[in-house]
Amino acid sequence: STSVLQADKKEITIINKNENTTLTQTIAPIFEKYLMEILPQRSDTLDKQELNLKSDRKEKEFPRIKLNGQCYFPGRPQNRIVCRHIAAQYINDIYQNVDYKPHQDDYSSAEKFLTHFNKKCKNQTLALVSSRPEGRCVAACGDFGLVMKAYFDKMESNGISVMAAILLVDNHALTVRLRIKNTTEGCTHYVVSVYDPNVTNDKIRIMSESKENIKHYSLMDFMNVDYSLLKWSNDHVINQSVAIIPALPKEQLLMLKGSVDEITPPLSPATMNLLMAIGQNHQLTQLMIQLQKMPELHRTEMLTAYNSINLPGLYLAINYGNADIVETIFNSLSETGYEGLLSKKNLMHILEAKDKNGFSGLFLAISRKDKNVVTSILNALPKLAATHHLDNEQVYKFLSAKNRTSSHVLYHVMANGDADMLKIVLNALPLLIRTCHLTKEQVLDLLKAKDFYGCPGLYLAMQNGHSDIVKVILEALPSLAQEINISASDIVDLLTAKSLARDTGLFMAMQRGHMNVINTIFNALPTLFNTFKFDKKNMKPLLLANNSNEYPGLFSAIQHKQQNVVETVYLALSDHARLFGFTAEDIMDFWQHKAPQKYSAFELAFEFGHRVIAELILNTLNKMAESFGFTDNPRYIAEKNYMEALLKKASPHTVR
């Protein structure tokens, strides 16, 4: 029978009449009404209300949290919480409270939990797994008790009475709490409590007076699931593996070193998945050698190591920042022992490690700005490609790391201004070009990094003022030119960053006054001249920066009163005109260049009433005429007189 005592304190007492024992459990207030619905028959006694379980229990809705990595509080489906975050919060609460018990009230409702739940908690599990504490291991779920016994041995010898750990089973996170409890009668109890956030944060506890008894328990003994979850339990708890990541203060973690070295997990995809996730590099290295003896189908299954939501093990390793795991996978596959053991299709499937949304592991690493993982992948790729005879198209496809919308991964890097990550990728390209025979078209396509709509990443970088992105590309071009034949026109096409829309990247930079972007390009002009044989034909498009309607970015800068931009453009022409072979006629052609509206730059400035800019254009022309010695040029004299005459007039709108 079941009874409820002191209803205002939300406690239930479970009475086992056969063994004459009782167990009191505090429940969260939000679950009280569900308990009342499940057990609705009460007596009239106020101090002791007896409840009987109805036979139609299966027809009732229980406050369950689904095993898909997310939980929903009943009645409030918009309040979604990721279950592993709750598991991490449990551990956090354990160490923040003297009694080592989470405050039940913090978990009593969606509102209270969200108040209690801080922003750092999202990274709490990631930080715990990524820190790879001593004593972590992957074991068969049936050996769960064996691991607990090993922990108890270390705890007892080091005088520690309480520890906790996160458990990863498939895509599901739980927490376990171990406690050595000395009773007043002089007995020692070893208590293992597993908290399962997917089952309303209840716990299942097993207590024993002997450590030897603990080791006989499997993880399934601690699972509290209803009928709808039995298949998941049978698939992933009974016959699979569990990763156990201890959560102890740093000064105590060292005591777990060597505690589970003798635990050997079963050879299965689930084991591989968890080994990659928690960073067990030593065990993984040994398994990679064993895999060479397997048939290809089983070998591929082991190396992809999917969990039940189709996340590959390599993807999880990248997600948790396990660069050494990534390096082990790539380097092991690069060894001659693996040559010919995998088809190219299966190999690329393993290396790409895509999630269900089509995002590859490389895409994830670059998006997370994980330089170590990206460096490990790029460093290992040339040898791996040589071992398995990958062609340039396969390597190009891997490097572009397109998602389902066909956007290049470098598009997001450039758009977000992540210059450091871009530099890592571009620095790896020369070796990849040599070893994998990437073509000029493939390399330029990587540099343009267009999205699904054909918009280059450099367009977004220039539009947003990310001059560091432009600088990294300009600095990488000379070394790339040593490997492939990049022409001056290719560079102009790259730097103007034309999109399928009306504008170009350089046009937008001038319009918005991003001086850092413009200066970066113009400062690189001498290098472009020396390396790519730039001439005046190549320089003029950069100075004008026309959009698709042939409207110059210089004119747009004038229209938007970007005086610094205008001054920089004319100064760049003045500084580099001789280097690029400009003649007096070329200079006058530039000054008299007209937009589709039939205005020159000076006329446009005058038309919009920007007198300061108009005077700047005139003064720059006069200085260049003196410097280049064409003060007697008829075109110059006529243009000078025309501009001076306009400036003397009080009102605009008198343009010829």
What are these regions (language model features)?
Residues 16-198, 203-263:
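Cysteine-dependent deubiquitinase/ubiquitin-like isopeptidase catalytic cores across multiple families
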Residues 274-275, 314, 362, 410, ...:
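Conserved hydrophobic residue in the first alpha-helix
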Residues 281-282, 321, 369, 417, ...:
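Ankyrin-repeat intra-repeat helix-capping/turn positions
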Residues 306-307, 354-355, 402-404, 450-451, ...:
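Ankyrin repeat boundary/linker residues
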